[in-house]
């Protein structure tokens, strides 16, 4: 299973389209928020199941604040991250992941890619394809793959 993970697109559907075209086919899309009113467009363009949460800029959206779902054998916690004060601290997000028995946490908000395993939990932030903030200012996203052995392989966020 190939999963495209994006966050913080902030209404830049042209950049989303470029990434989607480059990575197709994908089996699932996860969007970690700050969609900014483009959720219908993203769902239609994806052509696959979509998990999408609201970010701090998604005012008035019907999107959920958080999703806990099963992907393969993994319990996955998806959130934007702003309610947990990322990137300034990870302790609250880690505690929330443990409360939800999550093995994988996927979040956004910081616009900076992050991939780390702590206490048996994998934390992934794909960064931003529209407004990156890391030192290189390169747009980033992530690809997650679940293989037949139900092992997860998360590639480094790429541009």
Predicted regions and their residues:
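N-terminal active-site segment of His-dependent metallophosphoesterases
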Residues: 1-49, 58-60, 64-65, 137-140, ...
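Beta-strand-turn-beta hairpins that frame and shape the catalytic cleft
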Residues: 1-3, 68-77, 117-123, 144-151
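Conserved beta-sheet core of the metallophosphoesterase superfamily
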Residues: 51, 87-148
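Helix-adjacent hinge/juxtasegments
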Residues: 51-100
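Short active-site segment of divalent metal-dependent hydrolases/proteases
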Residues: 11, 37, 83, 112, ...
